[in-house]
Each structure stands twice: as structure tokens, then as C-alpha cells.
Amino acid sequence: MSELRDTRLEKCQALSDLGQGPYALNFEPTHRMAALHEAHADLPNGEEREVTVSVAGRVMTRRVMGKLAFFTLADETGTIQLFLEKAGLEAQQEGWFKQITGLVDGGDWLGVSGTLRRTDRGELSVKVSDWRMLTKALQPLPDKWHGLADVEKRYRQRYLDLIVSPDSRETFRRRARLVSGIRRWLDQRDFLEIETPVLQSEPGGADARPFETHHNALDLPLTLRIATELHLKRLVVGGFERVYELGRIFRNEGVSTRHNPEFTSVEIYQAYSDYIGMMELTEQMVSAVCQEVCGSCQITYQDTEIDLSPPWRRATMHELVEEATGLDFNSFSSREAAAVAMTGKGLHAPELADSVGRLLNEAFEQAVETTLIQPTFVTDYPVEISPLARPHRSKPGLVERFELFIVGREHANAFSELTDPVDQRQRLEAQQARKAAGDLEAQGLDEDFVTALEVGMPPTGGLGIGIDRLVMLLTDSPSIRDVIAFPLLRPEPRAADAPAMG
């Protein structure tokens, strides 16, 4: 690799000696590749068109065959073949054919001008009459036929992955279309996007361990936000009846195929609605965006057909757990009785799950969650695990909350929001006690948020959707790292830190 790099550095010097230089300031293409193909789709095989075009891109392949050479030039939209003929180039400037075939390597950025021809086999080509080195690459490209075999290298050097993998490029195009589609859908329905703080003195809105930092000038301990919920609710109190934010969230948690410590979510709040209204909003928005991004609500994920056409299945947590395990958690009068029954069914009853409600959630996660393949709204959660949700209108001990599961993964979480400041204070104080007892994911007591509720928040439905998991679903990606351009990875050991060999 070092020898190859040295050779390319020598070519940089040769380009400079020729007065061209290896790093151009600019170039003005007349067309991008896709537009060029579209504009001249009517050119018959074997014919030329005396129109001069200019294109720019990266050299992906090159073949030199005596007095002829063929390069493949790629830009973001597609590729074009370059046809280089010694006689034609030498007529423009002596030595050009030797220079371009000798000094241009795969991976270089090149700008060319010329006329168009279509080969007898139907390939549109630019017959090059002028060329310019735009950027000389010092490193070679991966094998275009095999790409990057090392999965971790694809994540560490995403730029290489994007160069050689059309599938990876399409994943991030779909991600961009999904994000813009969600914003457009909400904006068209009078939702207003307002940015809330990333740096916070009291993290809240989720059960998660935050990243901690420090503001030097104010000598103030701060955390990165773990949710946007509490600030968006303050905006509802302030009179914004339809508000949302699509942005980055940070949670100091483990890394897996479903979790990245830095991820993207959209949180949506609608005054005068409830969790039933948010179910309708969720299935309407997700199905509409899926139709826009994928062209259909019927998709395939890891060889399984998924139908995102509404309406989606709705079932309570109690119903699903009883269906899967035979356990009726409404019949248990104590935590101990529930734990014994769970153990009898081969389920684990952890000590931290200190109530019947928490054990119900454990049973759901162990026995039900991964079986929910088609879109399913799981409703009516225990109050113990839902400190920000409104008490259920008819079921004591439960709250009006749902989570959306698809392909065995949670994709959304929503409430009829708790608007009673007295009840909210009591629940957050209970969370505070768990936090003081060592629960690093328990929420603290945000006094200003409780004060905001005392000013008065109207009945409100709230919803959060994980963007990364939704992108995974719509791009058939098995890992969250496949849909985050630059996922968090452990740094590679430096050469000096590597263990000695031998």
C-alpha cells in the first residue's frame, strides 16, 4: 500500500509539472450522468451526436487497449463510459493520450468534455476531447465486485462503502426521503417543528442513563438530552397546540443491532387528542410515508412479507401475555404470586421488577415482544413503568399508553399525556426515589416541568417514533448500524498499542 501511494504521489508531481496540478479549484459539468442518459436516450446504436457535453465524477474502472482506452466515470446519479482515442486526443494536444492513460488511476476525480456516441451494444459514451484532473486519489478503491467484505470496515470507512455499494447509497437516499416525508406530512397538517435544548440540567422524558458533561463558564453540570418530551409539553402549555421535533437523542446505553447511543427520533404532541387519536395518526403517517418511499405499503423485511396498510392490529398487554403464557396478571394479588407463576412458566422474574405491573412488562418482553411481526399496537400499560402517561379511563392500575411493534421490535411509544400536576409530582418523586436507590435509568424530578403543568396543559396526545428503526424496516437492513451513516464504534487500537507478536 505504501509503494502504491508513493507511485500516486509521483503522478501528482507529474501533473504539477505539466501545469495541471492534482487538485483543481472547480469544474462546470453540463450534465449529471442520469440527466445525460435521459436527454440522449433517442441516440441510435452505432451513431454519434455532434454535441459537446462536460461531465465530472470518479473513475471507477479503466481499460487501456493499445491506442484506445475506456474509463467508467461515476457521479451521484449514475455512470457513463468514456471513450478515449489516441488520434483524437493527440490532435488536440500532443501527449494527451499518454498522460491520461498513464496519470489517471481508479478512484481519481476527473472532468472531461467531448461529443456523444452510442456503441453497437447500446452503451452511451463520451468521446473525450478534453480532460482535467480534479482530484488525484492516493488510496486505491476496494474491489468493485466484492466491496468491503469486512462489515466493521464498512461502518468505520463509510466513504468507501458508499463508493462501491449502490445498496448503501440507496439506503441513505431512502432515509433522507423518509425524514423529509415525515416533516412534510406533519407540516401539511399544521404541526409546527420547534427545536428544544440538547444540553439540559435535568434530563427527563424517558427511562435512560444520560451522557454527562460540564459547562465551564457557568461551572454547571449538564447532560445530553434523552428525550424531547418535557420541553415539547412546555410548548403545548405555552399555546402551541400541534408541535413536534425530529432530532438527535443521546442515551448512555449498550450497543446492539437495535441500539446506538446516538439516534434519531420524532416526538409529536397534539392538543385535545389522546392515545387513540395518536394510534390513528401513527398508522396514517407511517403508511403514507412508506408508500412515498417504497412505492407500496407491502414490503419485505428479512424474507418476511409485512403489510403496513391501515388499520393495524390493536391488543392490550394483558391479552397478549395471557395468550402467550396462559398467565392472567389481573388475578395476582401480590408481586410474589406473580413471580411464582412466571417461574412456573419458565420466565425470569427479576428482583428489580418490584410489582405485579413490572412483572407483567417482564413477561411481555420475554414471551410476546419478538412474536409481533405484523404491525401491532400494544395498549394499556402498567402505571409503574409509565410515569408520564394519563391513568386509564376505566382500568385501575393501568395508563393510556401504546407501543407499536413490527418485526418483533418497538417502533413507537405514545400516551394520553398526564396533565394532573399533583399526580405527576407524586410519580416523579417515586422515580426520584428509585434513582436515589441506584436505578441509573430512573427519571429525576423536574420542578419547572411540574410548574408548567400547574399553569395548565390541555388534554394532549403524545407520540415518539424511532427514525432509525423505521429506516431499517423500509430498507430491509438487519442492523441499526446499516442505516446510520457514522455509527458509534470503539476506536481501533493504534499501532503502538497493539499487542506484540511472536
From Swiss-Prot:
**Which Gene Ontology terms cover its molecular function?**
ATP binding; lysine-tRNA ligase activity; magnesium ion binding; tRNA binding
A GO term from the CC aspect = cytosol
The enzyme's main class, written as a single word, is ligase
State if Aminoacyl-tRNA synthetase is listed as a keyword. yes
Q: Does the keyword Ligase apply?
A: yes
Name the Gene Ontology biological process terms. lysyl-tRNA aminoacylation
Q: What does the entry's cofactor note say about binding and number?
A: Binds 3 Mg(2+) ions per subunit.
Reactions this protein catalyses: tRNA(Lys) + L-lysine + ATP = L-lysyl-tRNA(Lys) + AMP + diphosphate
* This protein's UniProt keywords: Aminoacyl-tRNA synthetase, ATP-binding, Cytoplasm, Ligase, Magnesium, Metal-binding, Nucleotide-binding, Protein biosynthesis
Cofactor section: Mg(2+)
Protein location: Cytoplasm
**CDD domains listed in its UniProt record:** LysRS_core, LysRS_N
EC no. given is 6.1.1.6
Q: Which family does it belong to?
A: Belongs to the class-II aminoacyl-tRNA synthetase family.
How this chain assembles, per its entry, is:
Homodimer.
Q: What is this protein called?
A: Lysine--tRNA ligase
Question: Taxonomically, what lineage is the organism?
Answer: Bacteria, Bacillati, Cyanobacteriota, Cyanophyceae, Synechococcales
